[in-house]
Amino acid sequence: MMEELHSLDPRRQELLEARFTGVGVSKGPLNSESSNQSLCSVGSLSDKEVETPEKKQNDQRNRKRKAEPYETSQGKGTPRGHKISDYFEFAGGSAPGTSPGRSVPPVARSSPQHSLSNPLPRRVEQPLYGLDGSAAKEATEEQSALPTLMSVMLAKPRLDTEQLAQRGAGLCFTFVSAQQNSPSSTGSGNTEHSCSSQKQISIQHRQTQSDLTIEKISALENSKNSDLEKKEGRIDDLLRANCDLRRQIDEQQKMLEKYKERLNRCVTMSKKLLIEKSKQEKMACRDKSMQDRLRLGHFTTVRHGASFTEQWTDGYAFQNLIKQQERINSQREEIERQRKMLAKRKPPAMGQAPPATNEQKQRKSKTNGAENETPSSGNTELKDTAPALGAHSLLRLTLAEYHEQEEIFKLRLGHLKKEEAEIQAELERLERVRNLHIRELKRIHNEDNSQFKDHPTLNDRYLLLHLLGRGGFSEVYKAFDLTEQRYVAVKIHQLNKNWRDEKKENYHKHACREYRIHKELDHPRIVKLYDYFSLDTDSFCTVLEYCEGNDLDFYLKQHKLMSEKEARSIIMQIVNALKYLNEIKPPIIHYDLKPGNILLVNGTACGEIKITDFGLSKIMDDDSYNSVDGMELTSQGAGTYWYLPPECFVVGKEPPKISNKVDVWSVGVIFYQCLYGRKPFGHNQSQQDILQENTILKATEVQFPPKPVVTPEAKAFIRRCLAYRKEDRIDVQQLACDPYLLPHIRKSVSTSSPAGAAIASTSGASNNSSSN
């Protein structure tokens, strides 16, 4: 840039230097039309050729120059070079000159022959008349700041021409405003109108020009520098904090990886220990099963023609009990025979002749025949006299001896009866143990034939331990959830590979429906469903809550029945769960309530219960359910017939209508079975027989056996549940409010006045006596 400036023509250098160092005042008349010209045109750097003073006509060059306003009478001021107005003619007027607002005080100029090697020309100090101290000082500072423009241009040669022009124009604006405020600007024949125009221009320039001074700029620069230092310090602090956080994150990541590795090792060790424990339990179960095979019995394969069937053979425990029963029976027969003989020797009462027995009559007939015949030898005489001696010995038994012998025989019979009862109780206990043994044998057989017997981990989460049971198309395994660290029950649904795709789809749809119903349920008396996932195209799994105990059906098979308090507690919990199922939206009918679907948490009848198996549940949505008639039974024939009401067996053109009263009937049947140890309808019948003989359709009234003794309130409750017509049967809401199931009402009755308590006790005693 500097090389380009030095290579310019000296006249152009003078022109460029004059643009930034000197501003002339027009000698021509005031032209109002040129007052709207921008002052920035003074510093414009157009490349267009301009008319210089050398190119002007001679008449203009020979004209005598008027004295400048700042020249005194004694002489002229410091000589100046050509004015900037001599080099430019404005488009606003025909004659050369400037507007009145462009008059500024003259400053020292460099001669046209001044070289650019001296960029800072000498500045002539001129007094500023008519200004106060601050204004004069400000004008002096503004005049002193003018030569800095060339120094900036030379110090920063890379600035473009437009930026230099803008800076020069800004300095010109400052000088114009200062000159307009001075009294010298009002001379040379200017009118008041021109002064007002100058004031307006000055105000306009003050509005667009910054008022910042060097001190303010320095202060701003210092503040900006301090702010910049603060920002840089803050940035450094943030960078250090970021580095610290990154270091902490790296440490946490390493620690997390370490903990993950440790957790994986713990999970691996847990799996190893669980598998080892499961194997030990399996071995113990198989050893016990082998021992029970000899004691309780086992299955043997028997051939019948071309087929083989399994036949049960009792063990030595049953054989010993059977032998003891045979011994007791033989002893009882012997005692009965001796009692008959003792009855023959019973002495007659006082004053009565002993009645002739059959033996005496036979002997008398024999003696009469012997008298007619002659004796042949002495042996015949002994034979004839022996019965006579026996008859005399029978007559010699006294009454005391007879009663003594009779008492002995009674005691012996009582002892045998007691032994027989003990043997019968032991036999029943062995039968229950045998049922468990048979169940365990089947479980072991199914487990050995299962494809999941080697402790696989399903879905990378559930470790299978051992088989709990097997149904028609599913297997239930006890498993361990490695993620939640809890035991669960995994139900594996396996479809038959020979099924058609349509049947598989229906089964899968049915299972998904059960999953959707069960997944939304959350009640303490309902088994929770945790998860659902697929294994392959023919199998999928549902993960359920695990309960240690057995179901109610197993308990009833072991104990036959239970007390009324225990049965009532179970029924209260079942009704509580049914109430929840009917309060949710949409309500749900379980439809398959039975002892096998009621789990005892701790295996006893005095604990908590949970309801499971929602495979046949019915959703009572608005589309299919009517509050008056109920909903159509689309799955007629499904379910357990002993626990279904009569309306489920009605056959007609349209499907039967059902409601939540189906579950109420099931509650009544379960309560009856818990109290009496048998089902109220079709106890010893199969489901096929119940269907063929219409057993449930004929169950118009329930009958109660005399034993065991049950309270009338319990019987009335069962009758309300087992009403034949569904219109007469109570629903679930009424069942939950039944007086028999409300403890506070029963307590209030029992804790009433003493007279009332006495009346209640006497009425209860009379009811018990009548029921007996």
Curated annotation (Swiss-Prot):
Residues 462-741 form the Protein kinase domain. GO terms for biological process: cellular response to gamma radiation; chromatin organization; chromosome segregation; DNA damage response; intracellular signal transduction; negative regulation of autophagy; negative regulation of proteasomal ubiquitin-dependent protein catabolic process; nucleus localization. Detected in placenta, fetal liver, kidney, pancreas, heart and skeletal muscle. Highly expressed in testis. Detected in spleen, thymus, colon, ovary, small intestine, prostate and peripheral blood leukocytes. Almost undetectable in liver and lung. The active site is at D592 (proton acceptor). Phosphorylated at Ser-750, probably by CHEK1. Autophosphorylated; phosphorylation promotes the assembly of higher order oligomers and enzymatic activity. Changing S617A: Increase in autophosphorylation. It catalyses: L-seryl-[protein] + ATP = O-phospho-L-seryl-[protein] + ADP + H(+); L-threonyl-[protein] + ATP = O-phospho-L-threonyl-[protein] + ADP + H(+). Serine/threonine-protein kinase involved in the process of chromatin assembly and probably also DNA replication, transcription, repair, and chromosome segregation. Phosphorylates the chromatin assembly factors ASF1A and ASF1B. Phosphorylation of ASF1A prevents its proteasome-mediated degradation, thereby enhancing chromatin assembly. Negative regulator of amino acid starvation-induced autophagy. This is Serine/threonine-protein kinase tousled-like 2. It comes from Homo sapiens. The gene is TLK2.
